[in-house]
């Protein structure tokens, strides 16, 4: 698996015109944010060695390199889901490739439902912690040399980014 990650990252590096440090996974309903990215270089997932292909309707299935708010970024327009039949290694493959490309900050978006009657469509939710109930765990198997076997899950999500997102949401 690690060899495939390196192979894919190497293939992308040969084609990348920028070296972004930030990535965004555009979830359901946010694929249109891709139109806000300027100076784009788009690569369909189907062209990328070892990359899964999204089967969800409305997920375009391409990597987009470009600028958003003046910052070099990498965006995934369309992602892969466990419920599509992919295993966790395949679902997490793009994120592992991003790490090999030098991505340091990852924003993940999605559409979700909630039980709280105070929640409204379009409300922004910020995840501060999670419990993994999936039967298959992405850390299962041989450890990659890129990180610890069992990473510290204390403050899994960046406290400063959470605060920044909350402050921006309050302004809007």
Model regions and ranges:
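Metabolite-binding pocket within alpha/beta catalytic cores that recognizes anionic/polar moieties
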Residues: 1-153
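Active-site-adjacent substrate-binding region
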Residues: 158-172
């Amino acid at each position: 698996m690690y060899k495939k990650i390196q192979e894919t990252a190497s293939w992308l590096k040969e084609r990348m015109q920028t070296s972004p440090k930030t990535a965004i996974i555009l979830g359901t309903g946010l694929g249109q944010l891709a139109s806000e990215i300027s100076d784009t270089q788009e690569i369909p997932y189907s062209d990328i060695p070892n990359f899964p292909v999204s089967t969800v309707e409305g997920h375009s299935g391409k990597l987009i390199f470009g600028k958003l708010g003046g910052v070099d970024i990498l965006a995934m327009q369309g992602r892969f889901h466990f419920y599509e039949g992919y295993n966790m290694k395949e679902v997490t493959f793009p994120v592992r490739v991003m790490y090999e490309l030098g991505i340091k900050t990852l924003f993940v978006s999605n559409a979700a439902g909630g039980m709280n009657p105070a929640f409204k469509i379009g409300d922004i939710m910020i995840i501060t912690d999670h419990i993994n109930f999936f039967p298959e765990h992405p850390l299962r198997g041989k450890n990659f040399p890129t990180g610890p076997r069992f990473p510290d899950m204390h403050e899994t999500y960046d406290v400063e980014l959470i605060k920044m997102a909350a402050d921006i949401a309050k302004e809007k």
